[in-house]
Curated annotation (Swiss-Prot):
Component of the U7 snRNP complex that is involved in the histone 3'-end pre-mRNA processing. Increases U7 snRNA levels but not histone 3'-end pre-mRNA processing activity, when overexpressed. Binds specifically to the Sm-binding site of U7 snRNA. Belongs to the snRNP Sm proteins family. The keyword Cell inner membrane does not apply. This is U7 snRNA-associated Sm-like protein LSm11.
């Protein structure tokens, strides 16, 4: 075999030659390599892994001994970029056409809120509210409670939505407190005519409306009589007491006096001025332009 290697010409060991003898090249220790500085792999699996991983496989093989510290742990270093792989990726990229029109950026949507949706209600009852907002027309809003009418708010509207929720400024409110207790079943239901008729009756002695006090005179109910102001005529008004039997004192038994409770006027009307107010749509009963 050694004699054949000595007699074999150099073309039999040349990989690029047509007369290359692979069996002779495997057993020959002097087989010339086309690239003398080529990297050697241990087996084909390592070579295939290098082809699939590119720079990663090369970096793993080159830095296998350097990637571990003295404690045996791997260091989280990124591998160096492979220029050959970068060139291959650049060749796969499609060329950019010079005369191509650039893509326009997406337009930002206009904000949608209560103020932008108010003009969209033109031609409807809500469109009239928008006209009152633009022309600053004073309106009146009738507000209800769980039983019926509560009061009237007169002012300028600044915002509203499709549910009839509205914000108003410079508001003058005329209202009556809700009826509670047994009076709920006995008092007549409040109407707009009764509300303003009651207000006219209370006008002569009006109080400060800003504090929510009643617009009419104070109640003319008398205060409950005190112990010191009790007259002897009131004491004698009770039923006659028979004299007690012998052996008992003849003093009369004390009578219990009941304090009279102040009568609450549920028909009392109040007025107040508000700088701004928010009215929920479920409480709106009627809206009309103030004359």
């Amino acid at each position: 075999m050694a004699e054949e290697e000595d007699e074999a010409p150099g073309s039999c060991l040349d990989v690029s030659s047509e007369s290359f003898n692979p069996l002779l090249a495997l057993y020959s220790p002097q087989t010339p390599l086309p690239f003398p500085d080529i990297r050697c792999f241990n087996n084909l699996a390592e070579y295939e892994s290098f082809l699939r991983g590119g720079a990663r496989g090369r970096a793993r093989g080159a830095q296998r001994g350097q990637s571990r510290g003295p404690g045996g742990k791997r260091k989280g270093r990124k591998p160096e970029p492979d220029p050959e792989r970068i060139e291959r990726l650049k060749q796969l990229m499609l060329p950019v056409e010079e005369g191509k029109v650039p893509v326009r950026p997406r337009r930002s949507r206009a904000p949608k809120n209560v103020l932008t949706r108010m003009p969209l209600h033109a031609g409807s009852p809500l469109g009239e509210l928008n006209r009152c907002v633009q022309d600053r027309i004073r309106i009146r809003v009738h507000i209800r409670t769980f039983k019926g009418l509560r009061g009237v708010c007169s002012g300028f509207i600044v915002a509203f939505d499709k549910f009839w929720n509205m914000a108003m400024v410079d508001v003058d409110e005329t209202y009556r407190k809700p009826v509670l207790g047994k009076a709920f079943y006995n008092e007549p239901q409040l109407t707009l005519t009764r509300l303003f008729d009651r207000l006219q009756l209370q006008e002569p002695g009006s109080h400060d409306p800003a504090k929510g006090r009643p617009a009419g005179p104070a109640e003319t109910l008398t205060a409950p009589p005190s112990k010191k102001s009790t007259q002897p005529s009131e004491r004698a008004a009770g039923p006659p007491v028979e004299p007690g039997p012998q052996g008992h004192s003849g003093n009369r038994p004390k009578q219990r006096r009941r304090n009279r409770k102040e009568k609450v006027d549920y028909q009392q009307v109040f007025t107040r001025h508000l700088k701004q107010i928010f009215i929920r749509g479920e409480n709106v009963l009627l809206v009309h332009i103030a004359e």
